[in-house]
Amino acid sequence: MNRKYRKTVIAGNWKMNKTPSETKEFMTQLKAIMPKGRWCDVALCVPAVCIPAAVRAMRETRVGIGAENCNAKASGAYTGEISTAMLTDAGCKYVIIGHSERREMYGETDADVNAKVLAALEAGLIPIMCCGETLAQREAGITAEHITMQIKLGLAGVPEEKIRKVVIAYEPIWAIGTGLTATPEQAEEVCEMIRSVVRKLYSSKNARAISILYGGSMNEKNAFELLAQPDIDGGLIGGASLVPEKVVKIIEAANQPTV
């Protein structure tokens, strides 16, 4: 895709899938078939126990490894949690923050998301901050209002000189596991709105530079059509990111010029 002002980012989210040994096998297969001369950024966000194996396997490549969550605290009595310093030391470049599953299953709030975004930036990580609306919110006509609030609260305190390091991922929660499908036009409408919010919060220059991803079941079959939209700069990929061949096809779609 022709992105004059910003990077195209293809980010995989493995969720709770694959063991460290399976991770090593996956990375070996992926390296063998990665397209040559790719220019889009590729991130693979994996379970915490898989991070060391992923980092070791991809050390000599341009693929960035990321985590699926972090804690905003630097250290302390937080059993089961992982700090941003731990992720950085382990070799992570990215971290997903505020995924819809974290918000729904574990009660993460916009304040939690904001604290994690600030901690990630402080640690030198690239936060992939998620936002999105439910079916009820969409049917009530409050998509723009809800997502605008998520972005404002999630980015609170992020200085202008760091906003370009943030990646925003739009998840149409209403179209995930519901049998409904978000069209490329519907996805573009929201991503364009997200960019306008960033423009109002920061500047037109920063809004043009920030990467906005689509996180609604992008796969090797629909990637090109979605990525052809002017305000969709990549994808946060779920199930398709677990298959090396599908990852490569999505990367190839991102590398194709649009008409």
Which ranges hold each PLM region?
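Active-site loop-to-helix "anion-binding N-cap" substructures in soluble metabolic enzymes
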Residues: 1-259
